[in-house]
């Protein structure tokens, strides 16, 4: 029998990638192409949607050619994508009306403030699980309607379509036959009712967005059409799985039960915890989001972001010059048994969940004459683990379920000193997978399950960790260290706020 493959399309913020998986979920090949970033004004970030489409098809053809795989040997395609990034295009010509507005773009912050002033915060929170923020798609759509000449009129006449990047890719792969998205991506638009599983008419009216723009929403694992015969040499390949990047990573890490969580240690951290088949309401400023829809079920997650994670290690390297490479942090941190009472609070851009203090600033506490660079390096690594515990504890309270295990990915997950301290601090196992491509793997699993290659039980069985870090710290020691962290955070908070007739700030 000929080998059959699953193709994962990973449409990210900085690149388009195509990853070929075999039936054992092993990577056969990867192709990647960087994307141009456009910054037309400070705080604005755009992509050329046509460049994304061209780059995505280019890497698909490259990975197939390099590895001698015929399109007909593809069992299915799965798609994962940068979330929230917004494009509007003409349904007849397929041409975008403007560059795509990227998730990081802040141009709609004033519009968000006006929505808050209109008293919409509670409605948005209760309906979508999100907070009003420029991050999400809704205000990006409204900006395009209001600021690109002729777009509002064309939208109201039904000539235009909206999509996040998954929708844009499927529409092009099917030559306009399918205008669809999945539950996970829809839940990031700030327009989707995550309880009723429908676009919310009240929010569409409040934002003055025509309903005709929006795609059909389908379960994450299922049918999203087939590729048009002209796309891949006559082959019609089922597009069978879609999930936003962070939800795809949660699936790729097989976090299928409430209380299972994944943390991606990148420049910042993205933490998601599976919270069950009912949405958990957060009292800590975490986001409630749809994890995925599969087998007639919808499952939910809580999401929290840490602003500064790997960026703190880069700071040690680039600004303080304490280390020559990020990898050196493990070597120096491992030369001391602990941080020697030192705490680094990397609040360079304020603090996110659960503190939400934009006036907090970075600080180092507990310095003595005996403090060496090894202690400061160790304390900086420890800060990633402390911030993760802050968010995980908030998730446990909000979801009403304790953490079962933390599965990790991203660059800093390779740091053994950090991973052991993370396990010690949380008091649960930290599991690191052998495949670091967990986002693409999640998309491949969703597609493979839809076409009958795997089931969720098989996926759970396949995701044996490469290494498990077991907690070995005494409870008293864990509590003592964490109390010190909380004290350090309290003293970092509110640093930049005006007080006593002047501005409290560091030079």
Swiss-Prot record:
Pfam families: FGGY_C (PF02782), FGGY_N (PF00370)
InterPro entries assigned: ATPase_NBD, Carb_kinase_FGGY, Carb_kinase_FGGY_CS, FGGY_C, FGGY_N, Glycerol_kin
One Gene Ontology molecular-function label: ATP binding
Annotated ADP binding sites: 13, 17, 267, 310, 411, 415
EC assignment: 2.7.1.30
Keywords: ATP-binding, Glycerol metabolism, Kinase, Nucleotide-binding, Transferase
Pathway(s) it belongs to: Polyol metabolism; glycerol degradation via glycerol kinase pathway; sn-glycerol 3-phosphate from glycerol: step 1/1
Annotated glycerol binding sites: 83-84, 135, 245-246
Ligand binding (ATP): 13-15, 267, 310, 314, 411
GO cellular component terms given for this protein: cytosol
PANTHER family assigned to the protein according to its UniProt record, in alphabetical order: GLYCEROL KINASE, SUGAR KINASE
Role this protein plays: Key enzyme in the regulation of glycerol uptake and metabolism. Catalyzes the phosphorylation of glycerol to yield sn-glycerol 3-phosphate.
Family recorded in the similarity comment: Belongs to the FGGY kinase family.
Name by which UniProt lists this protein: Glycerol kinase
